[in-house]
């Protein structure tokens, strides 16, 4: 057992359960006004780190030794954490959303499998997937895009299912029962129908506080933590 953490320009660390440092790896020395935000992702024998801010690089480290197994560069304006998406009848894909493009990589080799035109602005929300489709939000223009997994090459015209002008700048969505839910930083609750991106509701929440946390579902409730006015609880249904 181990704990992996990313500290931006201070690098990535691996500690045992007693807090002893096992290894540390550098990921770059770049900084930005918002600081660093991406978390490490562990899958199989590798630890993935989106170091777009520190070095415009996506790294894959051996989780036992910290050795850099592979990396890909030119990752731009991406504060998001990658996700490992399960593909029906196919191998898993490592999904990373960045400014202008959504990428899928082979998690083991780092080979770029496909790419799709994305949000034309910086990206913060984490992609979510369900039943072979990945949903990517981001940008100050608040966009949302759905892409079918499993493609190869440029899939913009073949696998991009829909794009919506209802999205999120900072917060990540949650998928539940055919719908996507999230709360925007301006305290707006949002619900999209996942099948076609149709807006189901967009309503102001009962708080004046800003919201930068991602929504959490537990059972039939959605929990939204505000910046300074507690937690707002919503029903996990499209109304």
Which residue stretches match the model-derived regions?
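Noncatalytic, solvent-exposed loop/strand surfaces
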Residues: 1-239
């Amino acid at each position: 057992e181990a704990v992996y953490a990313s500290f931006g320009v201070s690098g990535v660390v691996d500690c045992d359960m007693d807090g002893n440092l096992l290894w540390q790896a550098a990921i770059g020395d770049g900084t930005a006004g918002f600081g660093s935000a991406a978390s490490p992702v562990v899958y199989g024998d590798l630890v993935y780190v989106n170091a777009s801010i520190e070095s415009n690089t996506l790294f894959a480290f051996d989780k036992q030794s910290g050795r850099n197994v592979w990396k890909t560069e030119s990752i731009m304006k991406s504060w998001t954490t990658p996700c490992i998406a399960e593909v029906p009848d196919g191998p898993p894909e490592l999904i990373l959303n960045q400014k202008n493009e959504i990428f899928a990589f082979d998690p083991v080799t780092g080979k770029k499998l496909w790419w799709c035109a994305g949000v034309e602005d910086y990206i913060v929300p984490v992609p979510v997937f369900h039943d072979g489709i990945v949903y990517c939000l981001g940008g100050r223009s608040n966009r949302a895009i759905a892409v079918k997994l499993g493609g190869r090459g440029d899939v913009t015209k073949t696998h991009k299912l829909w794009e919506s002008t209802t999205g999120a700048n900072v917060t990540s969505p949650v998928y539940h029962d055919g719908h996507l839910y999230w709360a925007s930083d301006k305290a707006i609750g949002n619900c999209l129908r996942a099948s076609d991106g149709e807006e189901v509701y967009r309503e102001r929440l009962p708080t004046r506080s800003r919201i930068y946390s991602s929504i959490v579902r537990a059972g039939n409730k959605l929990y939204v933590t505000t910046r300074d006015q507690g937690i707002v609880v919503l029903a996990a249904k499209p109304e």
